[in-house]
Amino acid sequence: MDYTHQPALIPCGQDKYMPKSELLLHLKTYNLYYEGQNLQLRHREEEDEFIVEGLLNISWGLRRPIRLQMQDDHERIRPPPSSSSWHSGCNLGAQGTTLKPLTMPTVQISEVDMPVEGLETHSPTDSRGLKPVQEDTPQLMRTRSDVGVRRRGNVRTSSDQRRIRRHRFSINGHFYNHKTSVFTPAYGSVTNVRINSTMTTPQVLKLLLNKFKIENSAEEFALYVVHTSGEKQRLKSSDYPLIARILQGPCEQISKVFLMEKDQVEEVTYDVAQYIKFEMPVLKSFIQKLQEEEDREVEKLMRKYTVLRLMIRQRLEEIAETPETI
């Protein structure tokens, strides 16, 4: 059998494949929609594997609070290689630990050394009214290098706070705070992660939680494709979220990818989603119509089998009346 002319297939889930040409058409439409924006996707081939990579928008759909990890002052943070950012690692030791600030010895300065403003100083003079004679008392000149500064250990400087924030993303401007470390992100607010088409749903979940230093386990959450019609489709652990987003289309007014709790959300099929947005009186009228249609079908079946029953009985009677032939 000749396989040379078979189209290349791209995996899009467990035991699910699609032609590469079809995916490229979807990708072209996706990039045209986001032309000139950072949400455009790029593709490449690496060791005969077709890979798409870029940013994926994910909306927060959590109902319960999440816990942010506490920032560890001794956490190992690698300074960026840029020479202009040397200060981000200036407090790190050889093993990546934070060094304690050195305290210079404090020099005590007596009140005599400091002149008091507003008071006249009288120097001793000779009896002939000559210029005052300066005493040879040694004076201690205070300079910045002579006086050490005591820093309180429990207070972070502005540079320390900037360093911490550089290594921690915020959720809608919310950074870790010991008073607000447990909170619920605003429903529908959007974040994004940079992923590729080979990353499965669990991998994307772990990447998202690690980006914001969320302490909760990835097993508590799931990714859902939510349509404006109300349809909710949960992405399986074998699915590729970036491929799913491309196949759904780029417009987020039609469908979005949501991060939700596993035990709080149920999938809604397309057939059920058609009726979700109707009011109760309308839904009751639908039920009444369906009941009437069901009654008509039942009555039709009863008439059909009643006729069949009569035909069988007539035939049995005819057989009984006919004399047996030898």
Swiss-Prot record:
InterPro entries membership: RA_dom, RASSF1-6, RASSF2_RA, SARAH_dom, Ubiquitin-like_domsf
Residues of the Ras-associating domain: 176-264
Keywords: Cell cycle, Centromere, Chromosome, Cytoplasm, Kinetochore, Nucleus, Phosphoprotein, Tumor suppressor
GO biological process: bone remodeling; canonical NF-kappaB signal transduction; homeostasis of number of cells; negative regulation of non-canonical NF-kappaB signal transduction; ossification; positive regulation of apoptotic process; positive regulation of JNK cascade; protein stabilization
CDD domains in the record: RA_RASSF2
PTM summary: Phosphorylated by STK3/MST2 and STK4/MST1.
An example molecular function term from Gene Ontology annotations: protein kinase activity
Compartment(s): Nucleus; Cytoplasm; Chromosome, Centromere, Kinetochore
Limits of the SARAH domain: 272-319
Major subcellular location class: nucleus
Pfam families on file: Nore1-SARAH (PF16517), RA (PF00788)
Source organism, top-level taxon: Eukaryota
GO cellular component, as recorded: cytoplasm; cytosol; Golgi apparatus; kinetochore; nucleoplasm; nucleus; plasma membrane; protein-containing complex
Keyword flag Cell cycle: yes
Keyword Cell cycle: yes
Known role: Potential tumor suppressor. Acts as a KRAS-specific effector protein. May promote apoptosis and cell cycle arrest. Stabilizes STK3/MST2 by protecting it from proteasomal degradation.
Subunit structure: Interacts directly with activated KRAS in a GTP-dependent manner. Interacts (via SARAH domain) with STK3/MST2 and STK4/MST1.
Protein name: Ras association domain-containing protein 2
Originating organism: Mus musculus (Mouse)
Gene: Rassf2
